[in-house]
Amino acid sequence: MTKPDLASLEKTIDKAFDERDGINTATRGEVREAVEQSLVLLDRGEARVAEKQADGNWQVNQWLKKAVLLSFRLNPMEVIKGGPGQSSWWDKVPSKFDGWTANEFEKAGFRAVPNCIVRHSAYIAPNAILMPSFVNLGAYVDEGTMVDTWATVGSCAQIGKNVHLSGGVGIGGVLEPMQAGPTIIEDNCFIGARSEVVEGCIVREGSVLGMGVFIGKSTKIVDRATGEVFYGEVPPYSVVVAGTMPGKNVPGENWGPSLYCAVIVKRVDEKTRSKTSINELLRD
């Protein structure tokens, strides 16, 4: 789709979102067509909610988030087939794989293990592997990435190339508030088992999060070597583990509860990262 076509689509979506109180399952015409077209573009990876710019910053295409939100108003609940034991689900969003045959899977080029769930409008790039996991609408999973068992990729989350999301990892979805950016995991990152990255935080390229690291917008991310504290973003090629920081003393006492933080235990360059095992990086 050309830039003028995208601009026209964006204009229609923006206007419809401003007038969303009047949009419902009976709405037809230009608005419905624009929303459906937007979701197809997301599903094919021809458009994405956020795009990395040359300066390293991420540009968020808020109109595509609006299209996703409008789809909830437009689409009625319906039976979704494919449940265990020939049962069904009851939802507004069909499976990405609805109606797929071997031909569609071969063209898509990724591996979808039984019991993985991907909702329509999420993009999965070639050579990705989906274990029994959940990928929500509007998300983008790039080439060579492994989404391991029971991992969750939230709505509109952006997952880079050659990322490993270990078992039980949660990557938070961000649809609202509208001004919030999506959660982003850049290329060549490793996210350890049962870790959570949420609230539009960014894990920059080449970083390693150990098992059980939780990062939200208010989480202190402390560089042990410098004392520098980051919020909402893990710097590139950081090795991060769960830790604690001293808290304030309780009234009348000389002690207080420690508070959770994430600790950058080391930083490595790209060459070291590519040649060193994850276990070696985390051993300190």
UniProtKB/Swiss-Prot annotation:
Gene Ontology biological process terms in this record: diaminopimelate biosynthetic process; lysine biosynthetic process via diaminopimelate
Top-level taxon in the UniProt lineage: Bacteria
EC number of this enzyme: 2.3.1.117
Gene Ontology cellular-component annotations: cytoplasm
Record keywords: Acyltransferase, Amino-acid biosynthesis, Cytoplasm, Diaminopimelate biosynthesis, Lysine biosynthesis, Repeat, Transferase
CDD domains in the record: LbH_THP_succinylT
The keyword Ligase belongs to this UniProt entry's keyword annotation: no
InterPro entries assigned to the protein according to its UniProt record, in alphabetical order: DapD_Trfase_Hexpep_rpt_fam, Hexapep, Hexapep_transf_CS, THP_succinylTrfase_dom1, THP_succinylTrfase_N_sf, Trimer_LpxA-like_sf
Record-listed substrate binding positions: R111, D148
Keyword Acyltransferase set for record: yes
Pathway the protein contributes to: Amino-acid biosynthesis; L-lysine biosynthesis via DAP pathway; LL-2,6-diaminopimelate from (S)-tetrahydrodipicolinate (succinylase route): step 1/3
Pfam family, one: Hexapep_2
Localization (cell): Cytoplasm
Main location: cytoplasm
Sample GO molecular function, one term: nucleotidyltransferase activity
Catalysis performed (reactions): (S)-2,3,4,5-tetrahydrodipicolinate + succinyl-CoA + H2O = (S)-2-succinylamino-6-oxoheptanedioate + CoA
NCBIfam families: dapD, PRK11830.1
Assembly notes: Homotrimer.
Family: Belongs to the transferase hexapeptide repeat family.
Protein name according to UniProt: 2,3,4,5-tetrahydropyridine-2,6-dicarboxylate N-succinyltransferase
Natural source organism: Brucella anthropi (strain ATCC 49188 / DSM 6882 / CCUG 24695 / JCM 21032 / LMG 3331 / NBRC 15819 / NCTC 12168 / Alc 37) (Ochrobactrum anthropi)
Source species taxonomy: Bacteria, Pseudomonadati, Pseudomonadota, Alphaproteobacteria, Hyphomicrobiales
